[in-house]
């Protein structure tokens, strides 16, 4: 089918008319005849979109309507027509998830979720500039739904290498301090308003943390054959197994100290062994060595150089790629992928 070149102002007028009928008149008290005419016109919009599909385009080849049924007006629950897709969004189907199973798998990694108001660029004359959306932040992406009960994300974007920051100037009302924006690597801008300034700051901090976490998993390339051999030798290190051994050792020591008679048995087996009161117990499985130089940009991170011996105090943030370590009396978080076990046990 030959494509149709539709002027941009005509497309804008059509979108405004459809939005006015669908949104502005949805909750108005209309007569039975008026509501019937409204539904007939909306149905005609859907028929035109289905008939011309992606070939119903603007001059220059920019698609004005698609048959996907997802757009800035995707929260209008009217089955008689299919809305258009706005040009300011990244399609989840094309850029992030490819099937329902991938969506379900990603939702198992939810980091933060809640209602936000998303700013629309092409909201038209009658449409609202801000849309309320149920937003979900996972370890890899930012997804948003038409409501909390939505099963399929309407749109979203990958957070890798994105920039999140507070942006108070985008609103002039009392909620200006609750605004923030996210800029993706391809310079797409997504602007949101949270319920409160503290909630907005929390969204920004969580996104920044996840972006930093994705960057920390990238192993820098070094043109050094010796370094390559060192990395090769550490790939098979049983880190998880040694962690379990360390925890088991702690439990065994607790039992050893609490059960009477074990000390006598131990002394009978080894007469030369004498345990001094207050002697600290060293778990060599908690000591790691730096694989590369790591210079921190934040006060909560620990800087170290290759070969430094770091005492790991906690692996609480293991799922995010960070541990809590100590070096020369200084405590901070360290990227776990930059470390290798210091002792062979």
From Swiss-Prot:
Cite the Pfam families for this sequence: PH, SH3_1
Which residue numbers delimit the SH3 domain? Answer: 283-344
- Could you tell me which residues belong to the region Disordered? 226-274
Q: Where in the cell is it found?
A: Cytoplasm; Nucleus; Cell membrane
**What keywords sit in the KW lines?**
Adaptive immunity, Cell membrane, Cytoplasm, Immunity, Membrane, Nucleus, Phosphoprotein, SH3 domain
- Which residues belong to any copy of the PH domain? 109-212
The known PTMs are summarized as: Phosphorylated on tyrosines.
Q: Bias regions of kind Acidic residues — which residues?
A: 250-272
Q: How does it assemble?
A: Homodimer.
Function (record text): Positively regulates T-cell receptor signaling. Required for optimal conjugation between T-cells and antigen-presenting cells.
Q: What is this protein called?
A: Src kinase-associated phosphoprotein 1
Tell me which species this is from: Xenopus tropicalis (Western clawed frog)
């Amino acid at each position: 089918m030959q494509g149709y070149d539709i002027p941009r102002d005509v497309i804008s007028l059509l979108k405004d008319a459809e939005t006015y009928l669908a949104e502005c008149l949805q909750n108005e008290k209309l007569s039975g005849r008026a509501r019937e005419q409204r539904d007939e016109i909306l149905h005609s919009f859907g028929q035109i979109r289905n008939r011309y599909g992606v070939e119903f385009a603007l001059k220059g080849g920019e698609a004005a309507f698609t048959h996907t049924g997802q757009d800035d007006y995707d929260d209008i629950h009217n089955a008689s027509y299919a809305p258009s897709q706005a040009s300011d969004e990244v399609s989840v189907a094309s850029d992030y998830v490819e099937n329902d199973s991938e969506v379900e798998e990603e939702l198992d990694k939810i980091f933060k979720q809640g209602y936000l108001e998303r700013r629309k660029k092409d909201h038209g004359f009658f449409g609202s500039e801000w849309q309320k959306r149920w937003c979900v932040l996972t370890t890899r992406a930012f997804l948003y739904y038409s409501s909390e009960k939505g099963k399929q994300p309407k749109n979203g974007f990958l957070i890798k290498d994105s920039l999140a920051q507070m942006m108070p100037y985008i609103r002039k009302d009392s909620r200006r301090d609750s605004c923030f924006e996210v800029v993706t690597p391809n310079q797409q801008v997504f602007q949101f308003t949270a319920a409160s300034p503290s909630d907005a700051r929390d969204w920004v901090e969580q996104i920044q943390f996840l972006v930093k976490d994705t960057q920390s998993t990238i192993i820098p390339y070094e043109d050094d054959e010796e370094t390559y051999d060192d990395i090769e030798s550490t790939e098979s290190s049983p880190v998880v197994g040694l962690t379990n051994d360390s925890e088991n050792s702690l439990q065994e020591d607790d039992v050893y100290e609490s059960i009477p008679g074990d000390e006598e048995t131990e002394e009978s087996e080894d007469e030369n062994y004498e345990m001094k009161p207050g002697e600290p117990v060293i778990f060599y499985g908690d000591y790691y060595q730096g694989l590369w130089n790591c210079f921190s940009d934040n006060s909560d991170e620990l800087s170290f150089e290759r070969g430094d011996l770091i005492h790991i105090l906690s692996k609480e943030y293991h799922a995010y790629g960070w541990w809590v370590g100590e070096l020369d009396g200084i405590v901070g978080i360290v990227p776990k992928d930059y470390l290798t076990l210091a002792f062979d046990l």
